UniProtKB/Swiss-Prot annotation:
GO terms for cellular component: chloroplast; chloroplast outer membrane; cytosol; mitochondrial outer membrane; mitochondrion; plastid outer membrane; pore complex; TIM22 mitochondrial import inner membrane insertion complex. This is Outer envelope pore protein 16-3, chloroplastic/mitochondrial. The modification N-acetylmethionine is found at M1. Keywords: Acetylation, Chloroplast, Ion transport, Membrane, Mitochondrion, Mitochondrion inner membrane, Mitochondrion outer membrane, Plastid, Plastid outer membrane, Porin, Transmembrane, Transmembrane beta strand, Transmembrane helix, Transport. Homodimer and oligomers in membrane. Part of both the NADH-ubiquinone oxidoreductase complex I and of the TIM17:23 complex. Interacts with TIM23-2. GO terms for molecular function: porin activity; protein homodimerization activity. Voltage-dependent high-conductance channel with a slight cation-selectivity; selective for amino acids but excludes triosephosphates or uncharged sugars. Non-essential amino acid-selective channel protein and translocation pore for NADPH:protochlorophyllide oxidoreductase A (PORA) and possibly PORB. It is a multi-pass membrane protein. Disulfide bonds: none annotated. Disruption phenotype: Lethal when homozygous. Pfam families: Tim17.
Amino acid sequence: MDPAEMRYLEEEDGPLMKTIKGSITGFGAGTIYGTILATWKDVPRVERNVALPGLIRTLKMMGTHGLTFAAIGGVYIGVEQLVQNFRSKRDFYNGAIGGFVAGASVLGYRARSIPTAIAAGATLAVTSALIDSGGQTTRVDNGREYYPYTVEKRAEADS
């Protein structure tokens, strides 16, 4: 294995922390998505003994979509990290496997349909593989380090 690739595999975040971050990010994205969907729907009629029915419906949609996206993000990152550590390689196959498992398990379980599970898994796998295969060229180490400050003195600062 290439030393640069080994350095990339030895990040400060472990697989568990990456999985937690993926779940939290998915929950945030799903909550925002649920909020947007709730604004497009009609507000229900005022019901007896229900205070603020529009707010309750919005919060339910936010929670439902947030938890679904959190599960997809957590399963995707978890399986990707598991496959990456098992294979000791970092390529687009890891993301494709993670995408298929996440789509098939979470969305297939939610729809309770095997054809839907296979279609969702294949869609997420292809999407992940396309994104990963296109983005691998930007991670080449060119040896330059960029600092948020200058390391060279300016001539004006000396006088």
